[in-house]
Amino acid sequence: MRAAAAGGGVRTAALALLLGALHWAPARCEEYDYYGWQAEPLHGRSYSKPPQCLDIPADLPLCHTVGYKRMRLPNLLEHESLAEVKQQASSWLPLLAKRCHSDTQVFLCSLFAPVCLDRPIYPCRSLCEAVRAGCAPLMEAYGFPWPEMLHCHKFPLDNDLCIAVQFGHLPATAPPVTKICAQCEMEHSADGLMEQMCSSDFVVKMRIKEIKIENGDRKLIGAQKKKKLLKPGPLKRKDTKRLVLHMKNGAGCPCPQLDSLAGSFLVMGRKVDGQLLLMAVYRWDKKNKEMKFAVKFMFSYPCSLYYPFFYGAAEPH
């Protein structure tokens, strides 16, 4: 029995059909013996409280608009309290905002805020694979692999009781447009800039001598002089002597900030396996009050306890 949405319906209607299909399923465990897939044991963890259902609160923005109102705890990621769910789920809001796949919210919320039924309903493997195909390249651009907790082999095949792809098969309403490189999408507020600085290992004001294309990436090669380390982080002397930043998957997408290399740039990045990965780049504008404020007060900003996937994922600081 596959949970699938009515093609071409609006988001709420599609999920209503999905949940309607699931609600009639019997709750007795023996009636599920037909389905060959079984959820992996959750690390042998025992829960202090029995499963409960509660309203999805407004301050859980990742899932508050997912299309159903009640969620089950513990969830499918072993979170037992709503406070823990809120903290961990907030890390994924930026990924949702990137719109890397139309089913990102459905997939994530099936784990963080599973629909309230008598038995946990997992996402289908095909749903996981579809979202991973759309979002993993974006995450990799920032040096984050697809996380272990979301490995698709953990989820059931589509012939089992599971949540299938909802919106990924809808026809496109407009011709595809080449997206700006993820690292070149700009924040315009001081808070947004400081969030980016929080999630970056280093922040540098620099000039760019040249850009090279290599294996699908762009390489930004810094000029020898005119570098100012605003947040040195893990950068060593050898890193700064010849500063080379890798823009992952950046060879085939536009980056308006880099159309001209004249002037200085504000760059942010992470050091991963000895390589400097670009996370964000801005043209330096001394008249930009938001940028000046962010640079001046970056160390006063209350950074999240968790690194994000470009400003949110459950990687400890």
UniProtKB/Swiss-Prot annotation:
Keywords linked to the UniProt accession: Developmental protein, Differentiation, Disulfide bond, Secreted, Signal, Wnt signaling pathway
Pfam families reported for this sequence: Fz (PF01392), NTR (PF01759)
Localisation: Secreted
Signal peptide interval: 1-29
Main location: secreted
GO cellular component annotations of the record: extracellular space
GO BP annotations listed: anatomical structure morphogenesis; apoptotic process; canonical Wnt signaling pathway; cell differentiation; digestive tract morphogenesis; establishment or maintenance of cell polarity; negative regulation of canonical Wnt signaling pathway; negative regulation of cell population proliferation
Database matches in InterPro entries: Frizzled/SFRP, Frizzled_dom, Frizzled_dom_sf, Netrin_domain, Netrin_module_non-TIMP, SFRP5_CRD, TIMP-like_OB-fold
GO molecular function annotations of the record: Wnt-protein binding
Tissue distribution: Highly expressed in the retinal pigment epithelium (RPE) and pancreas. Weak expression in heart, liver and muscle.
Record's comment describing the protein's domains: The FZ domain is involved in binding with Wnt ligands.
Protein family (similarity comment): Belongs to the secreted frizzled-related protein (sFRP) family.
Role according to the record: Soluble frizzled-related proteins (sFRPS) function as modulators of Wnt signaling through direct interaction with Wnts. They have a role in regulating cell growth and differentiation in specific cell types. SFRP5 may be involved in determining the polarity of photoreceptor, and perhaps, other cells in the retina.
Protein name stated in the entry: Secreted frizzled-related protein 5
Source organism per UniProt: Homo sapiens
